[in-house]
Amino acid sequence: MPSYTHMPYVRPSAILLGIAFDHAASFLVYGPLMGDIWKRAMSTAPHVEYDAGSKTKKVATTYVSNFLSTAVQSYSIAALLQLTGTVTLKGAFFVGLYVFGASGLPDVVDYMFTESRGTPYILVKTISSLVKSVGLSVALIGYGVRRI
């Protein structure tokens, strides 16, 4: 009886690399590279009030949800690279652009027209999303996601 797998195998180290890449990209984009622009964009944004719960619980929840969503994103991009047979950096760049077009571009349009966000906010979010999709796919293909 043949064995069918619906989810391709991705090395756990590739997922960990993706998590590290995403956190490093967030640190660089929201920190040294565009931190001042981000602070200006957030100072003009309307503040959202949250319930007065435990700050430790909020931080833990935020970090765990970010970690899990980044792990899923890393697995998904690695699986997509594997299933499409991508072996070159150029191919990985285009796969990353397709992922950005499917996931990041609708957010940019939403920020512009629905939420009427300012240009600095849209700029930082777009660059962050682009780095996290295109950069992650290039980093993963450079690492060697595919089985040979």
Swiss-Prot record:
The chain crosses the membrane at residues 14-34, 80-102, 122-142. Keywords: Membrane, Transmembrane, Transmembrane helix. It is a multi-pass membrane protein. Belongs to the UPF0591 family. This is UPF0591 membrane protein C15E1.02c. The keyword Transmembrane helix applies. InterPro entries: DUF1761. It is found in: Membrane. It comes from Schizosaccharomyces pombe (strain 972 / ATCC 24843).
